[in-house]
């Protein structure tokens, strides 16, 4: 997790950094609403209630009246590649709308709290130790690590963040790097992405520890969580 955060990696690993000066000057908390494609399968199949992005923005503003609400619409919707169900302009009076091509890791580092329906960015926010509110049932909700608005009674394990990360990012997937798709450990995959994104200074690469402390891992809890992840429909 420390490598992912230190190297600024995220879901897409593209876009420009989000310096705070690009956001309105403020000493208030910043709460990010992650816009999604509203007819995406992750929402249709992963959320019992039907929320639009604008619904989430309004809920966020109501629950955080003293905070600065920042809304990032999904880039595929902004680009006209996917259908728009709710118009960001309808909530422009209660939030700051980011429509540029911003780097997601930099954006997460710039906020204190993230609201989402099912986006993977919610888990990336957890990795960066941000508070996360979830309205659907993505793989990382229901374990006691997020503010959940949808019950997930089958998820009975209570893993730590380290344990959930181990289950979801180390034990569950297989990693391939290079044009030949060579099998790799997660550390090699992270370094490959970091180098591909913008190069990694040697001193930073050598100064970041990739290992999870052994005392932070409960093997039984990780195994139970991993079984829970395997049962989630893809």
Regions found by a protein language model. Name each.
Residues 1-26, 144-234:
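Leloir-type glycosyltransferase catalytic cores
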Residues 28-40, 73-74, 137:
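Short loop/turn segments at strand-loop or loop-helix junctions that form parts
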Residues 35, 67-73, 217-220:
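Functional cation/ligand-contacting sites centered on basic and imidazole/sulfhydryl donors
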Residues 41-56:
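Mid-to-C-terminal functional-domain signal that highlights helix-capping/loop sites
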Residues 53-58, 84-87, 93, 103-113, ...:
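C-terminal structured domains
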Residues 57-100:
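Catalytic donor nucleotide-activated moiety binding site of glycosyltransferases and closely related
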Residues 101-146:
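A donor-sugar binding/catalytic signature common to diverse glycosyltransferases
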């Amino acid at each position: 997790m420390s490598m992912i955060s230190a190297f600024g990696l995220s879901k897409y690993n593209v876009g420009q950094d989000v310096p705070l000066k690009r956001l309105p000057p403020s000493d208030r908390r910043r709460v990010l609403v992650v816009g999604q494609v509203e007819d995406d399968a992750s929402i249709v199949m992963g959320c019992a209630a039907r929320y639009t992005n604008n619904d989430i923005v309004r809920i966020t503003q109501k629950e955080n009246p003293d905070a600065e609400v920042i809304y990032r619409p999904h880039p595929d919707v902004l680009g006209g590649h996917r259908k728009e169900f709710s118009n960001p302009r309808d909530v422009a009076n209660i939030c700051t709308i980011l429509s540029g091509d911003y780097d997601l890791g930099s954006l997460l580092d710039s906020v204190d709290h993230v609201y989402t329906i099912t986006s993977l960015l919610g888990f990336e926010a957890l990795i960066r130790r941000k508070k996360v509110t979830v309205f659907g049932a993505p793989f990382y909700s229901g374990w006691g690590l997020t503010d959940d608005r949808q019950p997930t009674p089958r998820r009975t394990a209570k893993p730590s963040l380290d344990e959930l990360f181990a289950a979801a990012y180390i034990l569950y997937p297989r990693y391939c790097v290079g044009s030949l798709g060579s099998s790799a450990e997660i550390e090699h995959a992270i370094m490959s992405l970091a180098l591909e994104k913008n190069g990694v200074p040697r001193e930073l690469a050598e100064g970041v520890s990739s290992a999870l402390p052994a005392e932070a891992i409960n093997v039984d809890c990780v195994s139970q969580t991993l079984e829970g992840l395997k049962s989630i429909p893809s």
